[in-house]
Amino acid sequence: MKGLFVTIEGPEGSGKTTLIKSLLPYFEQKAQKVMATREPGGIAISEDIRTILHKQEYTMMEARTEALLYAAARRQHLVEKVMPALNENYLVLCDRFIDSSLAYQGYARGLGMDKVFEINRFATEDCMPSLTIYLDIEPEVGLARIEKDAGREVNRLDMEDISFHKRVREGYLQVVERFSDRIVLVNADQPMEKLIEEVVQIIEDKLL
């Protein structure tokens, strides 16, 4: 693996997708081979799994089923899209990766971070990001952003009550502490222009 694998993590409404859309042209202008992708998704099989995971009517989905579907989507996305790009020396910017599963299913769903981590170690064969940016934001602020975004489709996870979203953030903060060697926490409750500047600086300082 020769490229650089950067993942962007955060609760709902933290601004991950908007940030990546801005990072992509910035690094392209620097003559950097760069690719943006997302989880779950990025390729046909994983996008189909994403549709299942996000369907509002699938409220009966059990936590382990959810965790396994995310891991399955992650595996296919990794081998079909991410690894080939890294082997071609790309900078890969990915919206979510294993840390989402640890925070959402491991902590917020109560499955246990260690169990979910082992599922994902099997799925990824221990392929981990070079760097992870965690966008930290209060759940109330993030959910308010989603409500104002008319272009964003509300998914099954968005519909969870506020206590779930608070657990997600608590889980993320534990993940940040556990993997402090590769995760950098950034305050997402700031103007997007400043957020972009801060994240660009972190990526350039640590990796480029």
Swiss-Prot record:
Residues involved in ATP binding: 10-17
What keyword terms does UniProt attach to this protein? ATP-binding, Kinase, Nucleotide biosynthesis, Nucleotide-binding, Transferase
Q: Which InterPro entries does the UniProt entry name for this protein?
A: P-loop_NTPase, Thymidylate_kin-like_dom, Thymidylate_kin_CS, Thymidylate_kinase
Which catalytic reaction applies to this protein? dTMP + ATP = dTDP + ADP
Which Gene Ontology CC terms are recorded? cytosol
Which GO molecular function terms does the record list?
ATP binding; dTMP kinase activity
Pfam families, sorted: Thymidylate_kin
Q: EC no.?
A: 2.7.4.9
Question: What HAMAP family does this protein's entry cite?
Answer: Thymidylate_kinase
UniProt protein name: Thymidylate kinase
Organism field:
Bacillus cereus (strain G9842)
Tell me the gene name.
tmk
